[in-house]
Amino acid sequence: MSNKFALVTGASSGIGMEIATYLASKGINILLTARREERLQKLAENLSKEYKVTVDYIACDLSNENAPNDIYAFCKSKDYQIDILINNAGYGIKTPFHETSMKDEEKFIRVLGTSVIALTKIFLPDMITNKNGKIMIVSSVAAFSPPSSIQALYGPIKTFMNRFSDSININYSQDGITSTALCPGFTVTEFHTSSGVQEEMDRVPSFMKFSAQRIAKEGVDAMFAGKGVCVPTKTYKFLVFLLKILPSSSLSLFGRKLAPGRYNEK
């Protein structure tokens, strides 16, 4: 058995599960991680049976600051060499920013931000030693969009993640390491239900919603091609192009129109 593995966070559903499935279909061993152990166990069994690869899992919550170190220790105990790192774990917060607690926001930052940095930092030295590494950070078109007061930190964190991915490419490409920021738009997953925004998702036109399977395939293909940024589908490529050329004043107005009633009532 090869000891080379792809580590996929947030692998129990949605884009993470589809990325794990697509990687397994390419004959790559997978280490799954997410909070829901039963789902991980079932997915591991299904993937290993379907694609004849080794699939293992470790249940953990990336809002726990020790989780990245626990994952690394697990890999070392099994002699797993992680040469593909998929930073996918994430969620949304529906509550307006001024109504959330600081603990809510700190947890949010740990899952979407700090854990990505920590996992990348932990596994990077081994990738440098092996002169080989593929990193994906599942970001969002929200990185290019005006922020809303419902998810005030979501877009800014994704913008930071895109720049962090750029930094990895600039500093470590000479070591055989590339990083890809995958920036999908509206994707049909459990994300919107678990984040309490399914009603808003239902109002999105069908031509702007895409399957997690398609997003995963485009993202993984871009990662193996060494692309720095992947915006899946022509629909969102065009949207991002518009967002980049619009003046900041127009983007701010657009953001206010997307904000909850406290703006729209004025």
Q: Residue spans of the language-model regions?
A:
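Conserved glycine-rich cofactor-binding loop
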Residues: 12-14
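Conserved glycine-rich Rossmann-like NAD(P)H-binding loop of the short-chain dehydrogenase/reductase
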Residues: 26-43
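Conserved NAD(P)H cofactor-binding loop of Rossmann-fold oxidoreductase domains
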Residues: 88-93
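Substrate-binding pocket helix/loop in short-chain dehydrogenase/reductase
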Residues: 96-98, 104-109
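Active-site helix of classical SDR
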Residues: 120, 156-157
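Residue(s) in the substrate-gating loop at a strand-loop-helix junction
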Residues: 140
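C-terminal helical subdomain
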Residues: 181, 202-239
